[in-house]
Amino acid sequence: MSAAETNQVQESLEKLNLDSSSSPAAGGATTATTTNNAESSDATSSSVPADSAEEQGESSGIAENSASLYVGELNPSVNEATLFEIFSPIGQVASIRVCRDAVSKKSLGYAYVNYHKLEDGEKAIEELNYTPVEGRPCRIMWSQRDPSARRSGDGNIFIKNLHPAIDNKALHDTFSAFGKILSVKVATDDLGQSKCFGFVHYETEEAAQAAIESVNGMLLNDREVYVGKHVSKKDRESKLEEMKANYTNIYVKNIDLAYTEKEFEELFAPFGKITSIYLEKDAEGKSKGFGFVNFEEHEAAAKAVEELNDKEINGQKIYVGRAQKKRERTEELKKQYEAVRLEKLSKYQGVNLFVKNLDEQIDSEKLEEEFKPFGTITSSKVMVDDAGKSKGFGFVCFSTPEEATKAITEMNQRMVNGKPLYVALAQRKDVRRSQLEQQIQARNQMRMQNAAAAGGLPGQFMPPMFYGQQGFFPPNGRGNAPFPGPNPQMMMRGRGQPFPEQWPRPGPNGQPVPVYGMPPQFQDFNGQNMRPQQQQQQQQQQQQQQQQQRGYYPNRPAGGNVPAKDLAALIANAPLEAQKRILGEELYQRIVATGKAQEPEAAGKITGMMLGLENQEILDLLDDEELFNNHFEEALNAFEEYKNSEGANAATGAPAPSEEA
């Protein structure tokens, strides 16, 4: 299209959209945007082949002086301008609306086109139906506003065992000889490949009956097709139990691969008259080891199942049972799995313990020895990785809940191999995460409500003093003088990489350059001779005492990010007043490492909010990356809302909320 033609199309569409609110299909299109994509290809879930309730939305029917058309099977990239180019040559278009998802605004794959004249609508169906639109043949039919008419099965037939090459147009051409067709649809998968079944909806019941009588059992593209009256999913499910009780079709598997179809039939012939038999084969004509046998009477099928199931034939036990559809079989397997899962949960409820922070030297046998004094242990296991190395946690299962409770009371926080154990009742990961998220969310909401009432966010966490390290610049906490030189975040090393300690380097005049955060006595360095060993030891002791006063411990790796299992031990050995600072340092560095809270104020505020949790909850956050990210995002959003409200108050001249929580 030229630029002038494109502008002309856009102007025409804008003019149409001005009147779209009064057009017959406008209301339907608007309502349809709130629905899910209705182009469902599930034959068993649609009472009509192509114009299901979801697919049609609330579009209007044919008005007295206008025609509303449904256009389906559209490529998601098709928009109103594309459809206008195709439908406008037929006649004057009243409105066009591509139905979109209310949230994502993505096309649902169908649209409504309204003409001013009924004749134009009829002409569009005749000339444009199955016309390729951006690589996909579109499907056009009259829009039906009445949902009862859409869901009616009158005139609706079902066709199965279609050749994959048969599409909507081919099916329409085949069945149009028996009467006026309202809609045709061949079911397809997500890739657009035929599922080998489809539907044809006639205007009258007589035309549908004529098609069933004429085409059922005929060959279409060398395939014998089945044609019958469409039965809705609801009606089929209501008759399912009756079908189970009177089945005639049986499924056989684990058949000897050398078995021929003739031998297969001879195996089942003694039980009654067989109407059809099928042995599945591969592309080379070799048996796949399973097949189906359909008897004329239910009694014959039941007798074959009773006598041949688990019977050994040619050294193999065959399975013989009632043939099931995939959906029914899947549902039964889900029920069996759920029953086993619930039984397992009830069996181990209150007796299975989760133990973490285990030393790497503790294996399953050692774990059982530690817990043996508290009762009878039915099983114990330390979880290991692919290399056989302990993951630092395991499970111990007792015979009674009383024994498990006693073990929790005695062993939780007990030091084993220099580490405090965490012992609690075992929970599924999804349940544990859900509970923890609910607890943290509730506390965050309470903290934010209290902060709002007090006029500000929770107190800011002041980042720790960073001791002199090569190539490292500390982040500027609020209230500190800006640190000169490169951006601190640009200079930060990777997580968990310690920095070698460094003495102050001499300045231009031979005087030592002060190192940020280093005690003054360590800065008296002439750059030539080290101090005597005794004086160095004394200074190291002084430095260690100052570090401990600030909540810093020498057994903690430089650079932070202590593994969670070691951090728990560090917390247990630290004074009560220093525990929050240790956790705060870990949280602060983790928050800065995300790259989303580069401002020191933001990192400090978010750290302060997350420090309001219990120590164990903070350890869980640091141990679970996904859980940490979820709660970090919540805190970040809360901080941004606070900053936005503060900015709005400043713009309007209103006093900003106090930051002193």
Curated annotation (Swiss-Prot):
Q: Where is the composition biased (Low complexity)?
A: 20-51, 533-549
* Pro residues bias: start-end ranges: 501-511
Segments forming a coiled coil = none
Query: Locations of Polar residues compositional bias?
Result: 1-11, 523-532
Identify the stretch(es) annotated as Disordered. 1-61, 473-563
Asked if the record carries the keyword Electron transport, the reply is no
Q: Which GO terms describe its molecular function?
A: molecular condensate scaffold activity; poly(A) binding; promoter-specific chromatin binding; ribonuclease inhibitor activity
Recorded GO CC terms: cytoplasmic stress granule; post-mRNA release spliceosomal complex; ribosome
- UniProt KW keywords: Cytoplasm, mRNA processing, mRNA transport, Nucleus, Repeat, RNA-binding, Translation regulation, Transport
InterPro entries the UniProt entry points to:
Nucleotide-bd_a/b_plait_sf (IPR012677), PABP-dom (IPR036053), PABP_1234 (IPR006515), PABP_HYD_C (IPR002004), PABP_RRM1 (IPR034364), RBD_domain_sf (IPR035979), RRM2_I_PABPs (IPR045305), RRM_dom (IPR000504)
UniProt cross-references to Pfam families, sorted A to Z: MLLE (PF00658), RRM_1 (PF00076)
Q: Which SMART domains match?
A: PolyA (SM00517), RRM (SM00360), RRM_1 (SM00361)
Keyword Transport assigned: yes
Q: Any idea where the PABC domain is? A: 563-644
Please give the positions of the paired cysteines in each disulfide bond.
Answer: none
The principal localisation class reads cytoplasm
Task: Tell me which residues make up the RRM domain.
Answer: 67-145, 155-232, 248-325, 351-428
One Gene Ontology BP term is:
mRNA 3'-end processing
Query: Which cellular compartments is it found in?
Result: Cytoplasm; Nucleus
Stored NCBIfam families: PABP-1234 (TIGR01628)
In the record, the note on similarity to other proteins reads:
Belongs to the polyadenylate-binding protein type-1 family.
Name under which the protein is recorded? Polyadenylate-binding protein, cytoplasmic and nuclear
In which organism is this protein found?
Lodderomyces elongisporus (strain ATCC 11503 / CBS 2605 / JCM 1781 / NBRC 1676 / NRRL YB-4239)
Provide the organism lineage as a comma list: Eukaryota, Fungi, Dikarya, Ascomycota, Saccharomycotina
